[in-house]
Amino acid sequence: MPIVCFDPPYELYLHWPLAGEVQSQYWGTGDRGISGAHWPAPGSLREAVSEKKKIIKKDT
């Protein structure tokens, strides 16, 4: 199940966690008032953006 994420410009996108990725790697779960929203931790931000690009390519 994808995790809904926000990057710094507040662009909504989906991030499929890698195997073994845990909830504690995200800051402020739900603190934006949206169920399941997460701020990616610094180490996972690049991965999340990479996944977003893959999704955009797949959808277009």
Swiss-Prot record:
The organism's place on the tree of life at top rank: Eukaryota
Name of the protein in its database record: Putative per-hexamer repeat protein 1
Organism classification: Eukaryota, Metazoa, Chordata, Craniata, Vertebrata
